[in-house]
Swiss-Prot record:
One of its GO terms (cellular component) is cytoplasm. This is Cold shock-like protein 7.0. InterPro entries: Cold_shock_CspA, Cold_shock_domain, CSD, CSD_CS, CSP_DNA-bd, NA-bd_OB-fold. Pfam families: CSD (PF00313). One of its GO terms (molecular function) is DNA binding. Gene3D superfamilies: Nucleic acid-binding proteins (2.40.50.140). The keyword Cytoplasm applies. The keyword Oxidoreductase does not apply. PANTHER family: COLD SHOCK DOMAIN CONTAINING PROTEINS. The gene is SC7.0. Induction: In response to low temperature. It is found in: Cytoplasm. It comes from the Bacteria. Keywords: Activator, Cytoplasm, DNA-binding, Stress response, Transcription, Transcription regulation.
Length: 66
């Protein structure tokens, strides 16, 4: 499982990007990948744990607060 910091997240559009700790490309995150009940959103500079999968680029899955 990787750790990173939310660069930005647009709650209206339901997606954003996470900067990986230790470098590497930014990781796309969709609201459906956030492990939460109710309204799923992330805050800028929030530290999160996530799994990286690959679609058109790196994508986050199983996102949860660190």
């Amino acid at each position: 499982m990787a750790t990173g910091t939310v660069k930005w997240f647009n709650a209206e559009k339901g997606f954003g990007f996470i900067a990986q700790d230790g470098g590497g490309p930014d990781v796309f995150v969709h609201y459906s990948a956030i492990n939460a009940t109710g309204f799923r959103s992330l805050e800028e500079n929030q530290v999160v744990n996530f799994d990286v999968t690959h679609g058109e680029g790196p994508q986050a899955e199983n996102v949860s607060p660190a």
